[in-house]
Amino acid sequence: MRRPSRIRSLAIAGTAILLAVISSPAQAHEPWDDGSVPPPPPSSPADGYSQNMHLLSTASHAGGVNSDLAFAGDLVFAGHYGGFRIIDISEPGEAVELADVHCNGPQGDVSVWGDLLFLSVDTPQSTPGCEGSRNVTATTPGAWEGVRVFDVSDPTAPEFLQAIRTDCGSHTHTLVPRKDGGTYIYVASYPLSASNIGPDCQAPFERISVIDVPGDDRTAGLAARVVAEPTVKGVDLFAGASGDFFACHDIQVLTPRDLAAAACLSQGQLWDISNPLAPRVTADVDTPDVDIWHSAAFTHDGKHVTFGDEYFGAPQEPFGAIWTYAVDSPSAPLSHLRIPRDEPSTYHNFNYVPVAGRNILVSSAYGSGTSVVDLTDPANPKEIAYYDMRSNQWSTYWYNGLIVANDISRGLDVLRLSGSQTAGARRLPMLNPQTQTFLLG
């Protein structure tokens, strides 16, 4: 049995905390310069780390809330609640910021596709574009939320192209590439608070938006549009005066198997996406010891899927773990693992290292920093490395021999894991962590 009232209170409480440091209008100065937003806490030194994890450099970004990441070549695209940054990591010991695009709109989930960048906005804005955009309520005339599209062909001077409105905004989004060079975008949406519930965000909701992007250049970015709003049913997330909502937080796709793993807050789901415009739920995944189904990732052999719980579990509680299931028989978990230290556990955003024969998961863990877990034996997970910055890391991913983390208040950290566990890992031309496009034997 799920705990919808508990999930609802946690989601709203977490949003309230983060909103305290969200930037307001898009502007050239930081939002706390005018006293409207309190400054973030100062950067903190490492609280603890394993001997096989090394911090190489930091591209600081003190301001607002830093969120998710995407990668292309030597560039990292780092979302934040006031826009996004582009950072050059060609010299890992000296990460260099190339651009910081100010375009208000939490929460800044980001992906890249050729010359294009897509940015999620799930708080109603006063305007679709960047200039003068500020947080408003869903009932404000002209309020907009959805996905913004940018041309990043010149990483030092990104250009806003258009804003695609989606019902209930875009909390996160996931690319689903096509063989014709275009991509679909799955947009996961739900109301973060009562002020976000507008006429197009009504209970039970039960759907995602699908955007069609016909290519990967400027012309395709301008032509992108919503082409479907398929229904996805499950266990209600919110139960209250505003009605019973069902929605998904994050969607992971494994395109070679036409699979998706949807972390839908009140349950996990597996989808058949052989028809990408009409995904079909094939399995419901649940356990009473998961409170907020937040993220998912497939192993690179396609045999297992790992879900993360965003509950902020205290050391004595079962919550906040990662849970691993067999894709072909997900009725019961193979294992779960909490942060194996005396501190709160929350596995937040993560991916698997692309290495054949081993399943190594790299994850952010909020206040517990970055955690690296060996799941080669899915029944016996073991943390093999960690780096705790005594702050809060939103996203951590493996990318081309590096571990890259976006810390909520500090900015981007570049780390390296020493040892043989990841030897032979595949190098990638680009990475949108929620999109897995290949299998390894």
Language model features with spans:
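Bacterial N-terminal signal peptides that target proteins for export
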Residues: 1-12
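Feature marking well-ordered beta-strand scaffolds used for ligand recognition
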Residues: 14-22, 27-441
